[in-house]
């Protein structure tokens, strides 16, 4: 193990096998907090390689408590976080809109570590019981098209790194692992990454994990579609990888001069999204969520982004999404 640590401290990349060994030790709690802190910091400064990410994924995947997989097609929408923008939870809001439109979504979620509030923090604010049994969550997926898999419940091995991550308060390789460790093993995925450099390595990882179709995107410094600038996309389709750019006009939308609102607290995040889901949100955030939902439809095979965006906007402005959220919360109510 010391040889592996020395390589990291000398700014050398690990191969897949070395990374697997390292993260196997981390997942079993064999690495002290001080050592783990130095590992994560050193890897962050020099940048994590694709081989290191795959090795870590393989190590943690051996510890996952798997979710009962449906026999129908479903998708995960997730961002790496760590873009330091403190934007509202677009992916969580988009998941609810997509489910209201009939798409099957199994969202892997967690509490905020490198952001003001993670998806799990927001979901709890909407009174969604993340600690319900897998059977109950599967029921909401079957009947209401959506369920949320709370990472700590399915990834017990992450507990050994949580304290260090909270102390560091910055993005680390763990931001890159979550999107590839959904306990339901979805065949489809939309992943937002915090920097453009991660696009190609992320889509290659999805290909190696045998995803049927997936899109990885980065927009204007965020891990979401942007309506302020160019969205950079890497897509996996029929075993081939494509790279392209998207602009607001591709969604039938105009460029927004102002950038997306940022939130300073969980309560502000909740209030903004609550209003949007009730059909009372501001135009920018409505359109931003609709554009992300349009990408979800595309992954499911509905290729017309403009039609997809229009459908999503109509659903958002109807207020039906909020009713859908309430139905999900009621189905998962604690006795």
UniProtKB/Swiss-Prot annotation:
Database matches in InterPro entries: Anthranilate_Pribosyl_Tfrase, Glycosyl_Trfase_fam3, Glycosyl_Trfase_fam3_N_dom, Glycosyl_Trfase_fam3_N_dom_sf, Nuc_phospho_transferase
Residue sites binding Mg(2+) 2 per the record: 223-224
Regions annotated as coiled coil: none
GO MF, any single term: anthranilate phosphoribosyltransferase activity
Residues annotated to bind Mg(2+) 1: 91, 224
Binding site for anthranilate 1: 79, 110
Subunit record text: Homodimer.
Top-level taxonomic group: Bacteria
Residue positions binding anthranilate 2: 165
Gene Ontology BP terms: L-tryptophan biosynthetic process
Residue stretches spanning the membrane: none
Enzyme class: transferase
Co-factor requirement: Mg(2+)
Catalytic activity: N-(5-phospho-beta-D-ribosyl)anthranilate + diphosphate = 5-phospho-alpha-D-ribose 1-diphosphate + anthranilate
One GO CC annotation: cytosol
HAMAP family: TrpD
Protein name from the UniProt record: Anthranilate phosphoribosyltransferase
Gene: trpD
Family in the record: Belongs to the anthranilate phosphoribosyltransferase family.
Keyword Transferase assigned: yes
